[in-house]
Curated annotation (Swiss-Prot):
Feature type site, description Catalytically relevant: K66, E118, E159, H200
Domain SIS: 48-191
Gene Ontology terms, MF aspect: arabinose-5-phosphate isomerase activity; ATP binding; metal ion binding
Organism in which the protein naturally occurs: Escherichia coli
Catalyzed reaction equations: D-arabinose 5-phosphate = D-ribulose 5-phosphate
Function: Involved in the biosynthesis of K-antigen capsules. Catalyzes the reversible aldol-ketol isomerization between D-ribulose 5-phosphate (Ru5P) and D-arabinose 5-phosphate (A5P).
Chain positions recorded as ATP binding sites: G63, M64, G65, K66, S67, G68
Residues involved in substrate binding: 82-83, 89, 95, 121-130, 155-157
Protein known as: Arabinose 5-phosphate isomerase KpsF
Gene expressing this chain: kpsF
Sorted UniProt keywords: ATP-binding, CBS domain, Isomerase, Lipopolysaccharide biosynthesis, Metal-binding, Nucleotide-binding, Repeat, Zinc
Residues at which Zn(2+) binds: H89
Amino acid sequence: MSERHLPDDQSSTIDPYLITSVRQTLAEEGARLQNLSKQLDSGQYQRVLNLIMNCKGHVILSGMGKSGHVGRKMSATLASTGTPSFFIHPAEAFHGDLGMITPYDLLILISASGETDEILKLVPSLKNFGNRIIAITNNGNSTLAKNADAVLELHMANETCPNNLAPTTSTTLTMAIGDALAIAMIRQRKFMPNDFARYHPGGSLGRRLLTRVADVMQHDVPAVQLDASFKTVIQRITSGCQGMVMVEDAEGGLAGIITDGDLRRFMEKEDSLTSATAAQMMTREPLTLPEDTMIIEAEEKMQKDKCLNVIGDQQGK
């Protein structure tokens, strides 16, 4: 196997114009998005949102090439925010995947030209099944648009690509339309963070929204009595490996906590440590939350109170 040589970043220089080109492209696509928001047909969007909201089956996306990639993302966003959805490849549809479609499903077909052959071939079958069709296209007079129940136009003069060939602006606009529809449905369905977490249990957000204090709290936290000496406190914090120790009163209730930070602050202001007791060093009334408190609520409370430790209380006190 021949050795591969990685390119040297210093072996060639980039024409400064290319950085200008990057800025120009971002500005142009941003301007096209602004233009779309101004020219959108509110009647068509109202019809589309009603179709999605009243769909009894799945919202199915389909598109070829780059439009297909965008369709997959749109479908994933809808599905993860409360609108059942999946993507079907138009070419695969003619080799058995049409069986995935039921009369209760709503189809969103994506084609910038509105004349993509593989997409148009789907239309007769979909009409025969009785499915409603939404077209996302840049050509309101196209064959696809004429056969759709609702049409969302891109209102795009040309692609940002200097050759007006590579799908660039069209995919950006289509992606934005997908996001806009999904967000409208989130608001219509009153889709809340807890609902979002049900579909994202493996992500960090899902963990924060589904996990309770009891699920992550440390048990067997070291404890000392109110009259414990400075040396005893140090020993218990060190052996506990949790950076803190709880201080218990005579009845075994929580009187306070002592953290590494509490020790440092106490040592800075006290000259004599040999006679110091836990009662003098501890933080009284530490942040205490019921064990069934959601982690996201606990984190917000800890940030607000500027503390690194929270005590989980079975009694909810």
